[in-house]
Curated annotation (Swiss-Prot):
This is Holo-[acyl-carrier-protein] synthase. Homodimer. It comes from Escherichia coli O157:H7. The gene is acpS. Its cofactor is Mg(2+). GO terms for biological process: fatty acid biosynthetic process.
Length: 126
């Protein structure tokens, strides 16, 4: 196994809150997968939930070396928790095609949040 990419992102939670206040659900619709959207709609801390997903997806896009462009979209990266509660990534569409092209065999996700910030790191391996 070799490390193919590493990405880190930090999000100011108040910034996400301000965008939601201005534009309603538009940001959530753009960032979240369908499964994440269903969770977000009833989540007890929707702003924090969205901020953490945003951080992971930005970190993943950086790990892939592309950013969000050329057909990649935030909602093609889905954050879920395994049976132990560990954050994991599931890919869809162009993100999945890119992972296959690069030979990605494993993705590691770490996620942390405090009162004002959410931070994520993603490592992709062959």
């Amino acid at each position: 196994m070799a490390i193919l990419g590493l990405g880190t992102d930090i999000v100011e939670i108040a910034r996400i809150e301000a965008v939601i206040a201005r534009s309603g659900e538009r940001l959530a619709r753009r960032v979240l997968s369908d499964n994440e959207w269903e969770i977000w709609k009833t989540h007890h801390q929707p702003v924090r939930f969205l901020a953490k997903r945003f951080a992971v997806k930005e970190a993943a896009a950086k790990a892939f070396g592309t950013g969000i462009r050329n057909g990649l979209a935030f909602n093609q990266f889905e954050v879920f928790n395994d049976e132990l509660g560990k954050p994991r990534l599931r890919l869809w569409g162009e993100a999945l095609k890119l992972a296959e092209k690069l030979g990605v065999a494993n993705m590691h996700v770490t996620l942390a949040d405090e009162r004002h910030y959410a931070c994520a790191t993603v490592i992709i391996e062959s």
